[in-house]
Amino acid sequence: MDGEQVKGVSVEVIEADLGDREHTSAIVDLIDAYSQDPLADGAPLAADVRDRLASGLRDHPTTLVFLAYDGARPIGVAVCFFGYSTFAAAPLINIHDLYVVPDARGRGVSRALLDAVSDRAITDGCCKLTLEVLESNVRARFVYEAAGFAQATYLPEAGGALFMAKPLAPPDKRFDRTMQGTLT
């Protein structure tokens, strides 16, 4: 996405080059800031996670990351992974992390990131975008709903889908220190 004015912020959204140190540094810094948010882990990333994050994203075969900039300053990130829908026999993109720095919130940066992901998904023939959001994160839910997201349902009478997780590491090795039973 070319640079555009979005509610007083000059936003440029680019697909990150995971071989570019400037991009990977911005990704790690933004994910670390996201981790410290009260609606995330509420604590910085562990040093070993910070050290492994860029190479882990680079080495994962389905990683797709978008960065939002205001001038030279990184202000948002969308970390995504390609998946596959067996019911549609088509690829999909899961937005695993979406974060905007606090002083750029409410200015359309999240929507610009979501639009960039959506454009890429359409280009790649994806059947849908998926994401998870805390029920209590009303602000994020509003943004997602305004962008066309809704709780996943397959049969209305069956109710909505739930996201579930099973930790595989012992408690002292879990990356998510605050939410018992989940890993981010």
Q: What is each residue range found by the language model?
A:
Residues 1-25, 29, 36, 170-184:
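Conserved N-terminal entry element of GNAT/NAT acetyltransferase domains
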Residues 8, 12, 125-184:
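C-terminal "cap" of GNAT-fold acetyltransferases
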Residues 27-35, 49-54:
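Hydrophobic alpha-helical core bundles mediating ligand binding, dimerization, or RNAP-core interactions
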Residues 43-65:
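Active-site rim helix/loop that mediates acceptor-substrate recognition in acyltransferases
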Residues 65-67, 73-82, 94, 99:
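Conserved beta-strand in the GNAT
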Residues 73, 83-95, 105, 125-127, ...:
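A conserved beta-turn-beta hairpin within the catalytic core of GNAT-like acetyltransferases
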